[in-house]
């Protein structure tokens, strides 16, 4: 299995157990599922009816998105101006990382072009996105984008391809 870590924070953001689809050569999208957390009942073997009904667990059921839950992603908020400021800074760090890892100038330019196109698409539908960060809550790290498919039911996450480093486990 491959785990994908943020190149800035080192946070685990996703794994190849989710079907990653490359978009425009600069991003990955992965469909998610809504899961229910909590609400478990535990049978301790005691006769609860003999002692009253006070022994039930007070667990609340919560619906979460599997990727968000599995990788402990934290919701954060951005207005459009703040997100663009973060994105500009983050793209600069990705380009530096690409250059440091031996990427050619052509590869970096190709990334820049694709990233600009993709970023325009994100900004065009900015209000539809939710923003997530890794558990370290590093303000310089990748912001994972969460949106819903056209059916309005299927959530999916978007991650910057060049901002991830894969580790085999």
Curated annotation (Swiss-Prot):
Involved in protein synthesis. Involved in microtubule stabilization. SUPFAM superfamilies: Mss4-like (SSF51316). This is Translationally-controlled tumor protein homolog. Signal peptide: none annotated. The keyword Cytoplasm applies. Belongs to the TCTP family. One of its GO terms (biological process) is negative regulation of microtubule depolymerization. Residues 1-169 form the TCTP domain. One of its GO terms (molecular function) is calcium ion binding. The keyword Transcription regulation does not apply. It is found in: Cytoplasm, Cytoskeleton. GO terms for cellular component: cytosol; microtubule. Keywords: Allergen, Cytoplasm, Cytoskeleton, Microtubule, Protein biosynthesis. It holds the Pfam family TCTP. Its main location: cytoplasm.
């Amino acid at each position: 299995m491959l785990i994908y870590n943020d190149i800035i924070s080192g946070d685990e953001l996703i794994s190849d157990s989710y079907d990653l689809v490359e978009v425009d050569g600069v991003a990955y999208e992965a469909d998610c599922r809504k899961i229910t957390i909590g609400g478990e009942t535990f049978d301790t073997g005691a006769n609860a009816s003999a002692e009253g009904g006070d022994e039930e667990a007070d667990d609340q059921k919560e619906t979460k998105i599997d990727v968000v839950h599995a990788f402990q992603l934290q919701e954060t908020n951005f207005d459009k101006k703040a997100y663009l400021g973060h994105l500009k800074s983050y793209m600069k760090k990705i380009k530096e990382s690409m250059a440091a890892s031996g990427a050619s100038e052509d590869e970096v330019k190709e990334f820049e072009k694709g990233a600009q196109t993709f970023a325009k698409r994100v900004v065009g539908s900015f209000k539809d996105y939710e923003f997530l960060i890794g558990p370290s809550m590093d303000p310089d790290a990748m912001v994972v984008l969460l949106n819903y498919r056209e059916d309005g039911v299927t959530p999916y996450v978007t991650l910057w391809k060049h901002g991830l480093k894969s580790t085999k486990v």
